[in-house]
């Protein structure tokens, strides 16, 4: 089996949706500008040698339709030789693409692939424009297949006995860690600044345009505290415990990695950053989809012949406080190595981008801590879990 090495990894900052900093930036623009920056750092690579662009996206329709991966390839690489394919495993889409690219290179089916994800929840709302559940499935008593994510978070909170107080405290810590990380410049080296052009009518009714650059995650709040979080009302269930404050944010963002074969790495004299050791997905009941990592993490560890104690850092996607705490408690995970710079509750969750975004963040922190093994894991809508183990090489 050949080796597949991650040699570059970048992301955009994450903007709030639907009225945040990227509300005027199309997803294909976000992604193509990120890829363009990443490839510019490897001038010795002939772009026509890239075998594929694999893009994760959770809602591939409208501005994210038309096989957005191919659109991104054309816009970002500015050559017609490189194909593109869009992949949807919902919240795990970005991580799935890294696994697919690594597997193709290891098997000899490719030498160089761009993998990652993009999501604009400003342009495409949660669930898309027209979700039509199968009436026959609902008739069979399986309506939970289509439950909204918030309702599943309530179910997890109830089943795993996660209190409102614990959820709010977890959310607060996510913001505190993220604000601290930003103040220390921890994300600067991984973020590609994106220029946004905003056109509007001024007070005189005249058309004006202004440009601004986005290089900092928009979500983390310095002013949040437990008192404010405790005041928020449940939004998914009467007398529930899941609020806007202890749930992940709707977001816009893009993240990508460049993966090469060992042969190409040597030929181009490039120093690898990391490699994917193993990847696993698992199915769980849709009504408690948030527990997905409880099944996926042991599975990937077994495949890799590793133990949880071998993992030095974990990026656990914080879809909701309730499910994050359920996973941590059920698997008895070490809280000190999880989301050390904050998670999706503070930093945002741009669905199909998140798996790649968390991987980029993981590599950056592994470099700083000189860690050897790291993990990216998340729950996935409709009852799935995903987990990937990375080895840091630099």
Per-region residue spans from a language model:
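Condensing-enzyme catalytic core mediating Claisen C-C bond formation in acyl metabolism
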Residues: 1-27, 225-291, 295, 302, ...
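N-terminal extracellular/periplasmic Venus flytrap/periplasmic-binding protein-like
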Residues: 11-13, 24, 28-33, 44, ...
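Glycine-rich loop/linker segments at domain edges
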Residues: 16-18, 102-160, 222-224
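Active-site-proximal alpha-helical scaffold in enzymes
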Residues: 88-118, 157-186, 256-263, 328, ...
């Amino acid at each position: 089996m050949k080796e597949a090495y991650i040699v570059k990894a970048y992301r955009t900052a994450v903007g709030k949706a639907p009225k945040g900093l990227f509300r005027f930036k199309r997803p294909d623009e976000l992604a193509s500008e990120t890829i363009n920056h990443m490839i510019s750092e490897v001038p010795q690579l002939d772009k026509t040698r890239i075998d594929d662009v694999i893009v994760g996206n959770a809602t591939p329709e409208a501005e994210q339709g038309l096989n957005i991966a191919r659109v991104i390839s054309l816009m970002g690489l500015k050559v017609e030789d490189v194909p593109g394919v869009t992949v949807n495993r919902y919240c795990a889409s970005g991580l799935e693409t890294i696994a697919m690219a690594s597997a193709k290179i290891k098997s000899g089916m490719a030498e160089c692939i761009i993998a990652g994800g993009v999501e604009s929840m400003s342009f495409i709302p949660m669930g898309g424009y027209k979700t039509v559940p199968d009436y026959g499935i609902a008739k069979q008593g399986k309506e939970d297949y289509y439950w909204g994510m918030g309702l599943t978070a309530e179910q997890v909170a109830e089943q795993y006995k996660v209190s409102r107080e614990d959820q709010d405290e977890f959310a607060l810590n996510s913001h505190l860690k993220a604000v601290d990380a930003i103040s220390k410049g921890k994300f600067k080296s991984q973020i590609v600044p994106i220029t946004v052009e905003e056109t509007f009518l001024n007070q005189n009714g005249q058309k004006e345009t202004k440009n601004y650059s986005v290089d900092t995650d928009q979500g983390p709040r310095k002013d949040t505290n437990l008192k404010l979080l405790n005041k928020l009302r449940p939004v998914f269930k009467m007398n529930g415990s899941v609020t806007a404050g202890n749930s992940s944010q709707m977001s816009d963002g893009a993240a990508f990695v460049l993966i090469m074969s060992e042969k190409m790495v040597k030929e181009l004299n490039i120093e690898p950053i990391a490699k994917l050791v193993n990847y696993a997905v698992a199915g769980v009941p849709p009504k408690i989809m948030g527990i997905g990592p409880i099944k996926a993490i042991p599975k990937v560890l077994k495949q890799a012949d590793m133990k949880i104690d071998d993992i030095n850092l974990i990026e656990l996607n914080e879809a909701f406080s309730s499910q994050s705490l359920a996973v941590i408690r059920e698997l008895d995970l070490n809280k000190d190595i999880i989301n050390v710079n904050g998670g999706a509750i503070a930093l945002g969750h741009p669905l199909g981008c998140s798996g790649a975004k968390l991987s980029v963040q993981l590599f950056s922190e592994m470099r700083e801590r000189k860690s050897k093994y790291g993990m990216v894991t998340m729950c996935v809508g409709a009852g799935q879990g995903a987990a990937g183990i990375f080895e840091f090489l630099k």
